[in-house]
Amino acid sequence: MTNIIDPIAEIDESRVADQDVVIGKSRIIFRRFMRNRTAVAGLFIFLALFLFSIFGGFLTSWDKDTIDPLNIGMPPSPDHLLGTTQAGIDLMALIVDGTRTSILIGLIVGGISVLISAVYGCTMAFFGGKVDAVMLFILEALIMMPAILVVAVATSGGGGLKDLPSWLLLVVVLLFFSWMGTARLVRSLSMSLMQRDYVKAAKYMGVPSRRIVWRHLVPNIGSLLVLDFTRGITGAILAEVAFSFIGIGIKLPDVSLGVLIGQATGQVSSFPWMFWVPLTVMFLLTGSLAMMNDGLRDAFDPSSSSIGRAKTKTAKAGK
């Protein structure tokens, strides 16, 4: 299991010496990850989809706003590599735009939610007492809010938000709910770190609170935050697909994988490519992130046997 609250174990492992060869901690983590074939495969799949979402438009001469009246509801062909929709729109162009939207939502929600979790959780643990009690009460109250109801109201234009793009509204709502569970875990781990001698010494010497949090607490829960980032991306993408599928997420003219899957669900028998293509892209996207997450978890694990292989290989190279 990943040791995210014992910095001594991490430090001891990051200095593996054999015949004057010392391997840095970050290098060990990188080697472990790169030796995990499943994780590397996931990384390549995700990068391929990411590049596809940016440059995929060059693979077709059509865009998502152009209708081909001569090819309406047609299967894949040389002119339309992934076929066309019932409206005569090139499916490749829609997939590129939808993949880009889904990845963008995942990255924004995953990144910002991790930052909020780290700041909120560490703040509760550092100050403790009444500050911790009040912040924990607020956290518990937010957790009890019904997410689906909030999403439905926000994306329908409630609260005077009609002028904002539907994908941006969904990002705001997902951010509102995505950080709470991790914040509680960060609080728990940070409270354990607060009992460490080096943290007590820093407080005794009058080191500013902000510096203690960012210098001593956040780095020692880094593995948790990295893993939560990849899980957050996956969770946000799946949430987008689920909410858009049932009609309370992203709405036209914005396009996402969830929108494409939802619109094609009732036409699987007549136009199967309209359903299976975006569904396959979604599985590849979330599956690659899950593979990367498993690889990162193993790479951060101090008990992993790959440290021994790294040590042996480096020692042989030094002879």
Locate the predicted segments by residue.
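Generic hydrophobic transmembrane alpha-helix motif, especially the helices
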Residues: 81, 91, 112-119, 125-196
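C-terminal transmembrane helix and the adjacent membrane-cytosol boundary/short C-terminal tail
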Residues: 160-164, 177, 223, 227-231, ...
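Glycine-rich helix-loop "coupling/hinge" segments at transmembrane-helix boundaries
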Residues: 143, 154-158, 238-281, 307-308
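Transmembrane alpha-helix signature in integral membrane proteins
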Residues: 42-43, 91-126, 285
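Short hydrophobic alpha-helical segments within the ABC transporter permease transmembrane module
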Residues: 94-98, 138, 145, 186, ...
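Transmembrane alpha-helical segments of polytopic membrane transport and secretion proteins
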Residues: 1-44, 292-319
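Transmembrane alpha-helices
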Residues: 100-116, 210-242, 289
